[in-house]
Amino acid sequence: MIKVSDLVIPTINDLELQNKKVLLRIDVNSPVDKNTGKLLDDSRIKAHSITIKELLKKGNSIVLISHQGRPGDDDFISLKEHSLLLSKYVGTEIEFVEDIIGPYAVEKIKKLDNKGVIMLENIRLMSEELIEAPPQQHAKSFLIKKLSPLFDAYVNDSFSAAHRSQPSLVGFPLVLPSAAGIVMEKEVSALSKIFNYEDSPKIFVLGGGKVNDTLKIIENLIKNRVADRILTGGLVAELFAVAKGINLGKKNMQVLENKGLLSLVPRARKMLLSGAPIEIPVDFVTEQENSQTLEEPTSNLKGTIKDIGNTTIEMYSSFIKESKVVVLRGPMGVIEDERFRRGSKALLTSAVEGPGYVIIGGGHMISMIDKNIQINENKVHVSTGGGALLLFLAGEKLPVLESLHLSWVVRSGKS
């Protein structure tokens, strides 16, 4: 069992999954080359191989369901290539079935031998899969009524889709014994540390350009008194600097205005006035009109902000090294330009080398850690959550976790 907030989530170890027929919901949704239709990244596909191997080890037969893209989009393609890649990573043949609930798919599922694995076609070919509704409603959907009688258990390994409330994600737990897969378990276990008050001090390093999303996270952290310090970078830091009454110079104010962020200043000021432990950079790396880069104090900026400065790096790093939990979401600077990656790289390195447990929101951030640094997987978690991670940090309920908890309540008789 995993406990997160007030939810109890069963894991595959809590179900007697031995020689059973298991429906496994995974999330292999991957970026696709528009010209060739080929997958550009298979990291999500590879991640799920662990859960499949564990279920096969116990003699279970597995039917995989997942989605890829949305109808009408360039990345809305078949799951055939996904099944081939999964076969490679699992080390066993995974048969692709070009059907979902038709007679062909039903026959294949019924005839599946122990330790056999098949993958059904893109679940979003079914129009009802695009409907967002409560688990109780989806439990009565055609998909669930058609497939659930064919299985002994349902396992959901799709944390990256946990913010969706669609039939294949939340409908089955009300009609089948259900549990979280290993990918889901790792994600939820890691994130549960964020709201565990014993794991303190907690440092949140929040940057990037998604300012409105980040403000929601900060508001939730303030409400629940979770963060000991919130270290800001990127446009988030610029917004809080303005909210503090600091003049960032005409160019930087223009950037904030062009992005429509000045309207958020009163909201940011309210957070500062609440006494929230929000830190802003004391210096920045800026780009001048002649493309020269300089380090300038926050109180006297001439150039355009591109990264946090050395003094800020040292200050932020000292906070990070004293923490028990570090959550990093969003870069400190314009990382698309090699010249402005230093702040993000330095803080990532401090976190990974420090004593605390590290949660990195967004796999792209991990690529900036120096390759010479040994990453201890027991203390560093790279979340694949995306939208689910954002909503979790912002205090929103995740329908997939709610449905798995509901399954546990129904089957255990507890609440």
Swiss-Prot record:
One of its GO terms (biological process) is glycolytic process. PROSITE patterns: PGLYCERATE_KINASE (PS00111). Substrate binds at residues 27-29, 44, 67-70, 124, 164. Pfam families: PGK. It is an enzyme of class 2 (transferase). It is found in: Cytoplasm. It comes from the Archaea. Keywords: ATP-binding, Cytoplasm, Glycolysis, Kinase, Nucleotide-binding, Transferase. Its main location: cytoplasm. Its EC number is 2.7.2.3. ATP binds at residues 336, 362-365. Pathway: Carbohydrate degradation; glycolysis; pyruvate from D-glyceraldehyde 3-phosphate: step 2/5. SUPFAM superfamilies: Phosphoglycerate kinase. One of its GO terms (molecular function) is ATP binding. It catalyses: (2R)-3-phosphoglycerate + ATP = (2R)-3-phospho-glyceroyl phosphate + ADP. GO terms for cellular component: cytosol. Gene3D superfamilies: Phosphoglycerate kinase, N-terminal domain. Monomer. Belongs to the phosphoglycerate kinase family. This is Phosphoglycerate kinase.
